[in-house]
From Swiss-Prot:
Pathway participation: Amino-acid biosynthesis; L-proline biosynthesis; L-glutamate 5-semialdehyde from L-glutamate: step 2/2
Gene: proA
Enzyme class: oxidoreductase
Annotated Gene Ontology cellular component terms: cytoplasm
Enzyme Commission number(s) from the entry: 1.2.1.41
Name under which the protein is recorded: Gamma-glutamyl phosphate reductase
Catalytic reaction list: L-glutamate 5-semialdehyde + phosphate + NADP(+) = L-glutamyl 5-phosphate + NADPH + H(+)
Keyword Repressor: no
Amino acid sequence: MRQEVHDAARRARVAARALAVMPTVAKDHALRAAATAVTAHTEEILAANAEDLQAARATDTLAATLDRLALDRQRIDQIAGGLRQVAALPDPIGEVLRGYTLPNGLQLRQQRVPLGVVGMIYEGRPNITVDAFGLAFKSGNAALLRGSSSAAKSNQALVEVLHAALVSEDLPADAVQLLSAADRSTVTHLIQARGLVDVVIPRGGANLIDAVVRDAQVPIIETGVGNCHVYVHQAADLEVAERILLNSKTRRPSVCNAAETLLIDAAIADHTMPRLVAALQGAGVTVHGGLSGDPDKADLCREYLSMDIAVAVVDGVDAAIAHINEYGTGHTEAIVTTNMAAAQRFADGVDSATVMVNASTAFTDGGQFGFGAEIGISTQKLHARGPMGLSEMTSTKWIVWGDGQIRPA
Protein backbone atom coordinates (compact mmCIF):
# COMPACT_ATOMS: atom_id res chain seq x y z
CA MET A 1 0.00 0.00 0.00
CA ARG A 2 2.90 2.35 0.68
CA GLN A 3 4.02 2.03 -2.93
CA GLU A 4 0.50 2.70 -4.21
CA VAL A 5 0.24 5.89 -2.18
CA HIS A 6 3.68 7.08 -3.28
CA ASP A 7 2.91 6.30 -6.92
CA ALA A 8 -0.32 8.28 -6.66
CA ALA A 9 1.58 11.18 -5.10
CA ARG A 10 4.12 11.16 -7.93
CA ARG A 11 1.33 11.26 -10.51
CA ALA A 12 -0.26 14.08 -8.56
CA ARG A 13 3.03 15.99 -8.65
CA VAL A 14 3.09 15.79 -12.45
CA ALA A 15 -0.50 17.03 -12.59
CA ALA A 16 0.23 19.80 -10.09
CA ARG A 17 3.02 21.17 -12.25
CA ALA A 18 0.62 21.43 -15.17
CA LEU A 19 -2.06 23.05 -13.01
CA ALA A 20 0.37 25.60 -11.60
CA VAL A 21 0.71 27.30 -14.98
CA MET A 22 -2.75 26.58 -16.35
CA PRO A 23 -4.65 29.68 -17.56
CA THR A 24 -7.58 30.74 -15.42
CA VAL A 25 -9.99 30.39 -18.33
CA ALA A 26 -9.06 26.71 -18.75
CA LYS A 27 -9.52 25.99 -15.05
CA ASP A 28 -12.87 27.74 -14.93
CA HIS A 29 -14.13 25.93 -18.02
CA ALA A 30 -13.14 22.59 -16.49
CA LEU A 31 -14.88 23.40 -13.21
CA ARG A 32 -18.09 24.28 -15.01
CA ALA A 33 -17.81 21.06 -17.01
CA ALA A 34 -17.37 19.14 -13.75
CA ALA A 35 -20.46 20.84 -12.29
CA THR A 36 -22.50 19.87 -15.33
CA ALA A 37 -21.23 16.30 -15.09
CA VAL A 38 -22.14 16.01 -11.41
CA THR A 39 -25.70 17.13 -12.15
CA ALA A 40 -25.96 14.84 -15.18
CA HIS A 41 -24.90 11.81 -13.13
CA THR A 42 -27.19 12.47 -10.17
CA GLU A 43 -28.88 9.06 -10.43
CA GLU A 44 -25.60 7.13 -10.38
CA ILE A 45 -24.32 9.18 -7.44
CA LEU A 46 -27.53 8.66 -5.47
CA ALA A 47 -27.44 4.93 -6.17
CA ALA A 48 -23.90 4.67 -4.84
CA ASN A 49 -24.83 6.76 -1.81
CA ALA A 50 -27.83 4.52 -1.13
CA GLU A 51 -25.47 1.54 -0.88
CA ASP A 52 -23.30 3.40 1.62
CA LEU A 53 -26.34 4.39 3.67
CA GLN A 54 -27.70 0.85 3.67
CA ALA A 55 -24.38 -0.50 4.94
CA ALA A 56 -24.18 2.23 7.58
CA ARG A 57 -27.70 1.54 8.88
CA ALA A 58 -26.87 -2.15 9.16
CA THR A 59 -24.18 -1.28 11.70
CA ASP A 60 -26.48 0.94 13.82
CA THR A 61 -24.66 4.10 12.77
CA LEU A 62 -25.61 7.23 14.73
CA ALA A 63 -28.20 9.53 13.20
CA ALA A 64 -25.71 12.42 13.10
CA THR A 65 -23.27 10.30 11.11
CA LEU A 66 -26.00 9.20 8.71
CA ASP A 67 -26.93 12.84 8.14
CA ARG A 68 -23.35 13.71 7.19
CA LEU A 69 -23.19 10.70 4.87
CA ALA A 70 -26.51 11.20 3.11
CA LEU A 71 -26.89 12.79 -0.30
CA ASP A 72 -30.12 13.84 -1.97
CA ARG A 73 -30.95 15.84 -5.09
CA GLN A 74 -30.76 19.12 -3.24
CA ARG A 75 -27.33 18.34 -1.80
CA ILE A 76 -26.04 17.21 -5.20
CA ASP A 77 -27.33 20.44 -6.73
CA GLN A 78 -25.48 22.32 -3.97
CA ILE A 79 -22.29 20.37 -4.74
CA ALA A 80 -22.52 21.30 -8.42
CA GLY A 81 -23.39 24.87 -7.49
CA GLY A 82 -20.29 25.04 -5.34
CA LEU A 83 -18.13 24.18 -8.35
CA ARG A 84 -19.78 26.92 -10.39
CA GLN A 85 -19.24 29.40 -7.57
CA VAL A 86 -15.55 28.50 -7.40
CA ALA A 87 -15.28 28.93 -11.17
CA ALA A 88 -16.74 32.42 -10.83
CA LEU A 89 -14.29 33.49 -8.13
CA PRO A 90 -11.08 35.39 -8.89
CA ASP A 91 -8.06 33.17 -9.45
CA PRO A 92 -5.63 33.67 -6.56
CA ILE A 93 -2.63 32.37 -8.50
CA GLY A 94 -0.37 35.18 -9.59
CA GLU A 95 -1.99 37.71 -7.26
CA VAL A 96 0.66 40.21 -6.16
CA LEU A 97 0.59 40.70 -2.40
CA ARG A 98 3.28 43.37 -2.31
CA GLY A 99 5.90 44.80 -4.57
CA TYR A 100 8.51 47.54 -4.44
CA THR A 101 11.78 48.70 -5.97
CA LEU A 102 15.05 48.71 -4.02
CA PRO A 103 17.52 51.62 -4.20
CA ASN A 104 19.73 49.45 -6.45
CA GLY A 105 16.92 49.13 -8.99
CA LEU A 106 15.86 45.55 -8.18
CA GLN A 107 12.11 45.15 -8.49
CA LEU A 108 10.65 42.77 -5.90
CA ARG A 109 7.25 41.13 -6.12
CA GLN A 110 5.63 38.63 -3.78
CA GLN A 111 2.87 36.65 -5.45
CA ARG A 112 0.60 33.72 -4.73
CA VAL A 113 1.51 30.24 -5.99
CA PRO A 114 -0.09 26.82 -5.45
CA LEU A 115 0.81 24.64 -2.47
CA GLY A 116 1.39 21.71 -4.85
CA VAL A 117 0.12 18.26 -3.83
CA VAL A 118 -2.56 18.51 -1.16
CA GLY A 119 -3.68 15.45 0.79
CA MET A 120 -7.16 15.43 2.26
CA ILE A 121 -8.31 12.97 4.94
CA TYR A 122 -11.97 13.17 5.87
CA GLU A 123 -14.82 11.27 7.41
CA GLY A 124 -18.35 10.65 6.29
CA ARG A 125 -19.33 13.61 4.14
CA PRO A 126 -19.02 12.78 0.40
CA ASN A 127 -19.58 16.41 -0.60
CA ILE A 128 -16.06 17.10 0.67
CA THR A 129 -14.75 15.02 -2.24
CA VAL A 130 -15.99 17.58 -4.75
CA ASP A 131 -15.44 20.65 -2.57
CA ALA A 132 -11.80 19.67 -2.06
CA PHE A 133 -11.31 19.05 -5.77
CA GLY A 134 -12.85 22.39 -6.73
CA LEU A 135 -10.78 24.52 -4.40
CA ALA A 136 -7.58 22.57 -5.04
CA PHE A 137 -8.02 22.68 -8.82
CA LYS A 138 -8.86 26.40 -9.03
CA SER A 139 -5.83 27.22 -6.86
CA GLY A 140 -3.54 25.09 -9.03
CA ASN A 141 -3.14 22.14 -6.66
CA ALA A 142 -3.51 18.41 -7.22
CA ALA A 143 -5.64 16.61 -4.63
CA LEU A 144 -5.03 13.22 -3.01
CA LEU A 145 -8.26 12.26 -1.27
CA ARG A 146 -8.70 9.67 1.44
CA GLY A 147 -12.33 9.48 2.52
CA SER A 148 -13.90 7.13 5.01
CA SER A 149 -14.86 3.55 4.24
CA SER A 150 -18.47 4.44 5.12
CA ALA A 151 -18.64 6.74 2.07
CA ALA A 152 -16.42 4.68 -0.24
CA LYS A 153 -19.00 4.04 -2.96
CA SER A 154 -20.25 7.64 -2.94
CA ASN A 155 -16.73 9.03 -3.14
CA GLN A 156 -15.79 6.64 -5.93
CA ALA A 157 -18.84 7.62 -7.97
CA LEU A 158 -18.06 11.32 -7.54
CA VAL A 159 -14.38 10.96 -8.47
CA GLU A 160 -15.28 8.94 -11.56
CA VAL A 161 -17.53 11.81 -12.65
CA LEU A 162 -14.74 14.32 -12.03
CA HIS A 163 -12.24 12.20 -13.97
CA ALA A 164 -14.57 11.98 -16.95
CA ALA A 165 -15.05 15.75 -16.91
CA LEU A 166 -11.30 16.40 -16.78
CA VAL A 167 -10.56 13.95 -19.58
CA SER A 168 -13.27 15.56 -21.72
CA GLU A 169 -11.35 18.84 -21.35
CA ASP A 170 -8.00 17.18 -22.22
CA LEU A 171 -6.79 17.79 -18.66
CA PRO A 172 -4.97 15.35 -16.35
CA ALA A 173 -7.32 13.08 -14.42
CA ASP A 174 -4.53 12.73 -11.85
CA ALA A 175 -5.41 16.23 -10.66
CA VAL A 176 -7.76 14.41 -8.27
CA GLN A 177 -7.17 10.89 -7.01
CA LEU A 178 -9.06 8.80 -4.47
CA LEU A 179 -6.91 6.63 -2.22
CA SER A 180 -8.21 3.34 -0.88
CA ALA A 181 -10.41 3.60 2.20
CA ALA A 182 -10.34 -0.16 2.72
CA ASP A 183 -6.81 -0.15 4.11
CA ARG A 184 -6.17 2.07 7.13
CA SER A 185 -2.47 2.18 6.32
CA THR A 186 -3.18 4.60 3.47
CA VAL A 187 -3.57 7.36 6.07
CA THR A 188 -0.17 6.60 7.58
CA HIS A 189 1.54 6.42 4.21
CA LEU A 190 -0.08 9.67 3.08
CA ILE A 191 0.87 11.70 6.15
CA GLN A 192 4.41 10.34 6.08
CA ALA A 193 5.03 10.92 2.35
CA ARG A 194 7.57 13.65 3.00
CA GLY A 195 8.90 15.08 -0.24
CA LEU A 196 5.93 13.76 -2.21
CA VAL A 197 3.03 15.51 -0.49
CA ASP A 198 3.22 19.21 0.39
CA VAL A 199 0.47 19.41 2.99
CA VAL A 200 -2.27 17.22 4.47
CA ILE A 201 -5.57 18.54 5.77
CA PRO A 202 -7.49 16.22 8.12
CA ARG A 203 -11.20 16.96 8.44
CA GLY A 204 -13.16 14.93 10.93
CA GLY A 205 -13.50 14.09 14.60
CA ALA A 206 -11.00 14.69 17.37
CA ASN A 207 -9.60 11.15 17.23
CA LEU A 208 -8.80 11.40 13.52
CA ILE A 209 -7.22 14.83 13.79
CA ASP A 210 -5.18 13.94 16.89
CA ALA A 211 -3.84 10.78 15.23
CA VAL A 212 -2.86 12.63 12.06
CA VAL A 213 -1.13 15.44 13.96
CA ARG A 214 0.71 12.95 16.16
CA ASP A 215 2.06 10.74 13.38
CA ALA A 216 2.52 13.11 10.44
CA GLN A 217 5.87 13.79 8.80
CA VAL A 218 4.43 16.29 6.32
CA PRO A 219 2.95 19.69 7.22
CA ILE A 220 -0.60 19.53 8.60
CA ILE A 221 -3.38 22.09 8.64
CA GLU A 222 -5.77 21.20 11.45
CA THR A 223 -9.47 21.61 10.82
CA GLY A 224 -10.41 21.33 14.44
CA VAL A 225 -13.27 20.15 16.55
CA GLY A 226 -16.10 22.66 17.02
CA ASN A 227 -17.13 23.16 20.64
CA CYS A 228 -18.89 26.42 19.73
CA HIS A 229 -20.52 28.76 22.25
CA VAL A 230 -23.42 31.21 22.25
CA TYR A 231 -23.11 33.79 25.04
CA VAL A 232 -26.26 35.74 25.93
CA HIS A 233 -25.07 38.99 27.48
CA GLN A 234 -27.11 40.91 30.04
CA ALA A 235 -27.94 43.52 27.37
CA ALA A 236 -29.21 40.97 24.87
CA ASP A 237 -32.48 41.27 22.98
CA LEU A 238 -34.02 37.97 24.08
CA GLU A 239 -36.03 37.45 20.90
CA VAL A 240 -32.82 37.80 18.89
CA ALA A 241 -30.97 35.57 21.36
CA GLU A 242 -33.58 32.82 21.08
CA ARG A 243 -33.55 32.96 17.28
CA ILE A 244 -29.74 32.86 17.08
CA LEU A 245 -29.48 30.08 19.68
CA LEU A 246 -31.98 27.80 17.95
CA ASN A 247 -30.42 28.34 14.53
CA SER A 248 -26.91 27.76 15.90
CA LYS A 249 -27.95 24.52 17.60
CA THR A 250 -30.68 22.95 15.50
CA ARG A 251 -30.09 23.98 11.88
CA ARG A 252 -27.61 21.13 11.37
CA PRO A 253 -26.49 19.77 14.74
CA SER A 254 -24.09 17.28 13.16
CA VAL A 255 -21.70 19.89 11.71
CA CYS A 256 -18.73 21.55 13.37
CA ASN A 257 -20.19 25.07 13.46
CA ALA A 258 -23.21 24.00 15.52
CA ALA A 259 -23.45 25.50 19.02
CA GLU A 260 -22.59 23.03 21.77
CA THR A 261 -22.68 25.31 24.83
CA LEU A 262 -25.02 28.13 25.86
CA LEU A 263 -23.61 30.67 28.32
CA ILE A 264 -26.09 32.96 30.08
CA ASP A 265 -25.06 36.12 31.90
CA ALA A 266 -25.70 35.80 35.65
CA ALA A 267 -27.37 39.22 35.70
CA ILE A 268 -30.30 37.92 33.62
CA ALA A 269 -30.14 34.17 34.29
CA ASP A 270 -33.19 33.99 36.59
CA HIS A 271 -35.65 35.08 33.93
CA THR A 272 -33.68 34.25 30.78
CA MET A 273 -32.67 30.66 31.44
CA PRO A 274 -36.21 29.27 31.75
CA ARG A 275 -37.18 30.88 28.45
CA LEU A 276 -34.13 29.69 26.51
CA VAL A 277 -34.16 26.19 28.03
CA ALA A 278 -37.85 25.85 27.17
CA ALA A 279 -37.14 26.97 23.59
CA LEU A 280 -34.35 24.43 23.26
CA GLN A 281 -36.42 21.60 24.71
CA GLY A 282 -39.36 22.58 22.55
CA ALA A 283 -37.10 22.14 19.52
CA GLY A 284 -36.11 18.65 20.70
CA VAL A 285 -32.76 19.55 22.24
CA THR A 286 -31.54 17.72 25.36
CA VAL A 287 -30.17 20.23 27.86
CA HIS A 288 -27.20 19.33 30.07
CA GLY A 289 -27.09 21.58 33.12
CA GLY A 290 -29.20 24.71 32.97
CA LEU A 291 -32.12 24.70 35.40
CA SER A 292 -30.70 21.62 37.13
CA GLY A 293 -27.38 23.36 37.84
CA ASP A 294 -24.08 23.71 36.03
CA PRO A 295 -23.18 20.81 33.73
CA ASP A 296 -20.28 18.47 34.34
CA LYS A 297 -16.87 19.55 33.10
CA ALA A 298 -16.98 16.74 30.54
CA ASP A 299 -20.18 18.22 29.09
CA LEU A 300 -18.55 21.64 28.82
CA CYS A 301 -15.73 20.15 26.75
CA ARG A 302 -17.91 18.04 24.47
CA GLU A 303 -18.62 18.41 20.78
CA TYR A 304 -22.00 16.69 20.77
CA LEU A 305 -22.77 16.81 17.03
CA SER A 306 -26.32 15.96 18.06
CA MET A 307 -29.42 17.56 19.56
CA ASP A 308 -27.67 18.13 22.88
CA ILE A 309 -26.33 21.29 24.47
CA ALA A 310 -24.59 22.27 27.70
CA VAL A 311 -26.00 25.31 29.53
CA ALA A 312 -24.04 27.28 32.12
CA VAL A 313 -24.14 30.65 33.86
CA VAL A 314 -21.20 33.09 33.74
CA ASP A 315 -20.66 36.29 35.69
CA GLY A 316 -20.29 38.85 32.92
CA VAL A 317 -18.44 39.21 29.63
CA ASP A 318 -14.96 38.66 31.08
CA ALA A 319 -16.08 35.41 32.69
CA ALA A 320 -17.61 34.34 29.37
CA ILE A 321 -14.32 35.04 27.60
CA ALA A 322 -12.38 33.10 30.24
CA HIS A 323 -14.79 30.16 30.05
CA ILE A 324 -14.61 29.96 26.25
CA ASN A 325 -10.83 30.25 26.18
CA GLU A 326 -10.62 27.37 28.68
CA TYR A 327 -13.22 25.00 27.27
CA GLY A 328 -13.55 26.01 23.63
CA THR A 329 -11.73 24.56 20.66
CA GLY A 330 -10.93 27.81 18.88
CA HIS A 331 -13.64 27.41 16.26
CA THR A 332 -16.61 29.81 16.45
CA GLU A 333 -18.15 31.77 19.33
CA ALA A 334 -21.14 34.12 19.33
CA ILE A 335 -22.26 36.94 21.60
CA VAL A 336 -25.79 38.32 21.63
CA THR A 337 -25.96 41.86 22.98
CA THR A 338 -27.07 45.41 22.26
CA ASN A 339 -24.01 46.74 24.10
CA MET A 340 -21.37 47.32 21.43
CA ALA A 341 -18.61 47.91 24.00
CA ALA A 342 -19.28 44.46 25.45
CA ALA A 343 -19.41 43.00 21.94
CA GLN A 344 -16.04 44.51 21.06
CA ARG A 345 -14.51 43.30 24.33
CA PHE A 346 -15.79 39.80 23.59
CA ALA A 347 -14.54 39.89 19.99
CA ASP A 348 -11.09 41.04 21.10
CA GLY A 349 -10.78 38.64 24.03
CA VAL A 350 -12.04 35.36 22.61
CA ASP A 351 -9.22 33.31 21.06
CA SER A 352 -11.12 31.62 18.25
CA ALA A 353 -10.97 31.54 14.47
CA THR A 354 -14.36 33.26 14.13
CA VAL A 355 -16.35 35.49 16.47
CA MET A 356 -19.98 36.25 15.68
CA VAL A 357 -21.67 39.37 17.04
CA ASN A 358 -25.46 39.01 17.00
CA ALA A 359 -25.30 36.28 14.37
CA SER A 360 -25.56 32.50 14.28
CA THR A 361 -22.49 30.28 14.55
CA ALA A 362 -23.83 28.51 11.45
CA PHE A 363 -22.39 31.28 9.28
CA THR A 364 -18.84 29.99 9.78
CA ASP A 365 -18.74 28.32 6.40
CA GLY A 366 -16.76 28.87 3.24
CA GLY A 367 -19.88 29.20 1.11
CA GLN A 368 -21.41 31.73 3.49
CA PHE A 369 -18.14 33.68 3.56
CA GLY A 370 -18.22 33.93 -0.23
CA PHE A 371 -15.54 31.30 -0.88
CA GLY A 372 -17.82 29.11 -3.02
CA ALA A 373 -16.84 26.13 -0.90
CA GLU A 374 -14.32 25.35 1.78
CA ILE A 375 -11.60 22.79 2.30
CA GLY A 376 -12.28 22.93 6.03
CA ILE A 377 -12.28 25.32 8.97
CA SER A 378 -8.80 25.70 10.39
CA THR A 379 -8.50 26.18 14.13
CA GLN A 380 -4.73 26.52 14.12
CA LYS A 381 -2.87 29.81 13.84
CA LEU A 382 -0.15 29.11 11.28
CA HIS A 383 -0.76 29.43 7.53
CA ALA A 384 -4.56 29.56 7.70
CA ARG A 385 -7.25 30.19 10.31
CA GLY A 386 -11.01 29.93 9.91
CA PRO A 387 -12.80 28.79 6.73
CA MET A 388 -10.25 27.82 4.12
CA GLY A 389 -11.02 29.07 0.64
CA LEU A 390 -8.89 29.62 -2.44
CA SER A 391 -6.37 32.02 -0.91
CA GLU A 392 -5.71 29.62 1.96
CA MET A 393 -4.81 26.95 -0.61
CA THR A 394 -1.81 28.96 -1.76
CA SER A 395 1.71 29.80 -0.69
CA THR A 396 3.87 32.66 -1.97
CA LYS A 397 7.12 33.17 -3.77
CA TRP A 398 9.30 36.18 -4.47
CA ILE A 399 10.15 37.21 -8.01
CA VAL A 400 13.02 39.66 -8.37
CA TRP A 401 13.55 41.59 -11.62
CA GLY A 402 16.94 43.05 -12.31
CA ASP A 403 19.02 44.40 -15.17
CA GLY A 404 22.43 43.02 -14.30
CA GLN A 405 22.81 43.96 -10.62
CA ILE A 406 25.37 42.05 -8.56
CA ARG A 407 25.80 42.16 -4.80
CA PRO A 408 28.89 44.03 -3.60
CA ALA A 409 31.52 42.16 -1.59
